């Protein structure tokens, strides 16, 4: 985001000249330092053969696939289903704004959802109708849930509860 342009854009949104249609690109947690990704955060230095600190640093990534929304959605599912080591977890207290969250000055209705499979490829289609009083754009996000099979469990395969596989934004709808 180029700072000098934010003023005009923000003014257009606040005055209603433009209806906001963006979505959050990450999960906004109440305490970001409590996420698995933050547990390994730090400035770890490499040492040379004499034990002296070098100018090179590293980070150890141990959270696997459970970063961003995948962590929060999977932990929520584990809590609901009583599986794994999710423990006592309250999604509403942990997540302030979920991945893909957004506001608009109008409202939309989705209908006529279709999913067509051709081999391993799925094409999803939905009709989006503006039901509000002002023009705006909407974002449709498509998530899938993969079965967690006995093979996955036996072999330690990690799968998130849900995964974003596609999205699209409508044109301006009156």
Where are the regions a protein language model picked out?
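Secreted, periplasmic, or luminal enzymes acting at the cell surface/secretory milieu
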Residues: 1-137, 143-145, 151-153
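Intrinsically disordered, low-complexity Pro/Gly/Ser/Thr-rich segments with frequent PxxP/GP/PP motifs
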Residues: 140, 151-174
């Amino acid at each position: 985001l180029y700072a000098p342009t934010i003023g005009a854009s923000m003014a257009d949104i606040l005055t209603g000249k433009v209806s906001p249609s963006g979505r959050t690109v990450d999960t906004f947690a109440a305490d970001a330092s409590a996420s698995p990704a933050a547990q390994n955060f730090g400035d770890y230095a490499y040492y040379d053969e004499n034990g002296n600190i070098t100018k090179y640093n590293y980070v150890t990534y141990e959270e696997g696939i459970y970063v961003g929304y995948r962590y929060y959605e999977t932990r929520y599912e584990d809590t609901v289903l009583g599986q794994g080591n999710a423990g006592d977890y309250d999604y509403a207290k942990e997540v302030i704004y979920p991945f893909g969250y957004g506001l608009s000055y109008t409202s939309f209705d989705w209908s006529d959802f279709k999913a067509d499979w051709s081999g391993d490829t799925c094409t999803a289609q939905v009709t989006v109708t503006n039901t509000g009083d002002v023009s705006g754009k909407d974002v449709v996000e498509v998530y899938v849930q993969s079965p967690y099979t006995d093979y996955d469990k036996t072999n330690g395969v990690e799968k998130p509860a849900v995964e974003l596989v596609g999205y699209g934004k409508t044109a301006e709808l009156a």
